[in-house]
Amino acid sequence: KPNSHHFFNIKNKSIFTHIKLNIYPDGGIARIRIYGSMKILKNFTGKVLNLTSVLYGATPIACNNEHFGRAENILAPGIGKNMGDGWETRRSRGKNFDWLIIKCAAAGKIKKIQIDTHHFKGNYPDKCSIQAALINKKISGKAIVNNSKKWKLLLNKVKLRAHQKHNFKNNLMKDKKVNYIKINIFPDGGISRIRVFGKAE
């Protein structure tokens, strides 16, 4: 149909690296978007890398709010273009906090954490904390969210500042292998990027 979005479900479960689009007999297409789960074929075992990078296969599992900016943005490489290129939640007037759960690209032992509030000057979170867990069995996203309340602290609640990178060492779970990260922001606000560096195992 003209001037329309067309969605098609694909049942093929194979892994692909290239896509070829054929049109019959001719004509114009504005955009093509292929949605799916990334499968990283490279073996990162023994290497120190950003375990929360989308380039290596990290993915957001759930968050409680993404009113002004999508959660997946904070896994992107490089510096955010603007506030809209980060994760930002709506203003909270209560005592609640906002959170985001990330499945790491690989399981690993965490060495360093970086929270980047680039572009967020009057709407960055006052504080944040990070929890982590190692989940080897396949469970639902809902179960992960419920269980995350009991995850161990990877980073105690720390103060954040506007428009800068915050670097923290892992002093709480040095010898613990993890593959899920939960970032809690107090009470709300925006974060441009999160980078969790660790040795993949």
Give the label of every model feature segment.
Residues 1-99, 108-109, 118-201:
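Trp- and acidic/polar-enriched beta-sheet ligand-binding modules for extracellular glycan
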